Amino acid sequence: MATWLAIVLIVLALILGLVGGFFLARKYMMDYLKKNPPINEEMLRMMMMQMGQKPSQKKINQMMTMMNKNQQDQLKKSK
């Protein structure tokens, strides 16, 4: 086998590996963040209390719904 062919195949395999690894890692992170959102109701309640607001369940539900909707919109835009 010619040396230049071996070099081309190695570079091609490296590029394909990097691209494949990127997309696999991206999919893994998207699934992970969907299952384990970075903020939950308890964190939201604590943040509202720190800001001096009285956290009612209705407000927390509204904020969680709004955050989930924004996350879904961003997912649609990225696809």
Curated annotation (Swiss-Prot):
Superkingdom of origin organism: Bacteria
Protein source organism: Staphylococcus saprophyticus subsp. saprophyticus (strain ATCC 15305 / DSM 20229 / NCIMB 8711 / NCTC 7292 / S-41)
GO cellular component: plasma membrane
Any Pfam family hit: UPF0154
Membrane topology: Single-pass membrane protein
Disulfide bonds: none
Membrane-spanning intervals of the chain: 4-24
The keyword Secreted appears for this protein: no
Main subcellular location: membrane
Cell location: Membrane
UniProt keyword annotations, A-Z: Membrane, Transmembrane, Transmembrane helix
Matches recorded under InterPro entries: EF-hand-dom_pair, UPF0154
Membership in a protein family: Belongs to the UPF0154 family.
Transmembrane helix in keyword set: yes
Protein name: UPF0154 protein SSP1415
